Amino acid sequence: MRMIKTYEGMTMNCDVIATIQSVFMNITTGSISEMVDDGFDPDNLEFAVTAFTTFGDEIVLAVYATEEERDYARYKLENWLVYDVGSYY
């Protein structure tokens, strides 16, 4: 069983992760959006990776300063999770 530590410091079982998504996050308010709109202040904009669980919860896994860092982290995380599932068979 693999565990992962979330952005908030919570530890969760990777088996409950249904999907991983790249999002934008307002670090002042904590609001998350799939697209940047006029309500986002560029000075407070960060790039985040979230996970939807099998229970329907959205959890912030990590926050990054650049879009490139976020996308690379998502790629690595998705490969790590797929490798883990494949290792059971």
Q: Locations of the language-model features?
A:
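Eukaryotic intrinsically disordered, low-complexity regulatory linkers and tails enriched in Ser/Thr/Pro
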Residues: 1-89
